A protein has these predicted regions:
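Surface-exposed amphipathic alpha-helices with a cationic face
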Residues: 130-134
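Short, flexible loop segments at the rims of nucleotide/cofactor-binding pockets, characterized by
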Residues: 25-30, 77-81, 159
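Charged helix-capping and loop-helix junction motifs
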Residues: 118-127, 160-166
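N-terminal secretory targeting modules
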Residues: 1-50, 62, 66-67, 96, ...
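Oxyanion-hole/transition-state-stabilizing segment in secreted/luminal serine hydrolases
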Residues: 52, 57-75, 82-123, 146-150
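A short helix->loop->beta-strand "cap" motif at the edges of active sites that frequently abuts
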Residues: 136-139
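Catalytic His-Asp segment of secreted/periplasmic serine-dependent ester chemistry enzymes
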Residues: 146-239
C-alpha cells in the first residue's frame, strides 16, 4: 500500500507523455482512481448529480457542455467496464455526496474490454453500485445502454441483441428497486438495433445531435429521481 501521488502532466505534455501515462495507468491504476482525484478534491459544494460511466458519459461533457451546468459532474472514463467503475464508485461518487447518481454502463462489458465476463457479473456490478448509492442517501438513475450494431474495436461482434437483453434487465431492476430508468435506447435506436442515422459518427458514440436527443430523457429522469426517497435498504430482495 502506498500514498504515492498521481502522475501530473507537465505544461508541455505531448502525445508521447500521454502514451506513457496510459501505460502507467494500465499497470498501476486499473480503475483509474487518479483520473478525477484532483477534480474531486476541488469540489466544494454538494453536487446535484454525478454521471458515472464510460466514454459515452465522458464525451457528453465534451460534445454537449451546456448540459453540464453548475451542480452536474461528469465522471465518465473512456473504455471502462463495470468492475472498474465499481472500484472507483466510492471515490468518484459517494465521497462527493451528490443528491443523485446517473449510471450508464455496459457497452465495454459486452465488448470484453477488461477480459472475459458474464451477464451475471455485469448485473452484480450494477446492483452493487445502486446499493452503495442508496445506502448513502443518493438517488439513482440507471441509463440504458445506447444502441449499436457493431464495435469498431471488436471486428465481427454483433452486440445489438445483447444490448437489448441487458436493457430489458435494467428496466426491470429499476422498477423492482424503485430506481429511475432513463431510456436512451428508445430515443436513439433504429429498428435493427443500430444507432439512428445522423446521431453518431461511428455507430457507438453519440455526436452532438445524439446528445441533444438524450438531454430531455436525462432531464426527465433526474427530475423524477430527486423526488424518490433514498434512505434505507432496498425495498425488495435480489432476484
Amino acid at each position: 500500500m502506498s500514498d504515492a501521488p498521481c502522475p501530473v502532466p507537465s505544461a508541455k505534455a505531448d502525445d508521447g507523455w500521454q502514451k506513457a501515462y496510459r501505460g502507467w495507468v494500465a499497470g498501476n491504476d486499473w480503475p483509474w482512481l487518479c483520473r478525477y482525484k484532483a477534480a474531486n478534491l476541488s469540489v466544494n459544494a454538494r453536487p446535484d448529480v454525478v454521471f458515472m460511466g464510460d466514454s459515452i458519459s465522458e464525451l457528453w461533457l465534451v460534445r454537449d457542455p451546456a448540459f453540464f451546468r453548475a451542480g452536474r459532474l461528469d465522471r465518465g472514463i473512456s473504455g471502462q467496464t463495470t468492475p472498474q467503475m465499481l472500484v472507483r464508485f466510492m471515490a468518484d461518487v459517494v465521497a462527493l455526496k451528490p443528491k443523485a447518481v446517473h449510471i450508464m454502463a455496459g457497452t465495454n462489458d459486452i465488448a470484453g474490454n477488461t477480459g472475459p465476463t458474464s451477464v451475471e457479473a455485469w448485473r452484480n456490478n450494477i446492483r452493487a453500485m445502486a446499493d452503495l448509492a442508496r445506502a448513502n442517501g443518493i438517488a439513482v438513475v440507471l441509463g440504458s445502454i445506447p444502441p449499436a450494431a457493431s464495435f469498431a474495436w471488436r471486428p465481427g461482434m454483433q452486440p445489438a441483441a445483447r444490448i437489448a437483453e441487458l436493457n430489458g434487465w435494467l428496466k426491470g431492476f429499476a422498477a423492482e428497486r424503485r430506481l429511475v430508468y432513463a431510456d436512451y435506447y428508445a430515443a436513439l435506436a433504429a429498428p435493427d438495433g443500430s444507432m439512428k442515422p445522423g446521431l453518431s459518427s461511428d455507430g457507438v458514440h453519440p455526436n452532438a445531435a445524439g446528445y441533444a436527443v438524450m438531454d430531455p430523457v436525462a432531464e426527465a429522469a433526474l427530475a423524477e429521481a430527486l423526488k424518490v426517497p433514498t434512505a434505507g435498504p432496498p425495498s425488495k430482495p435480489r432476484r
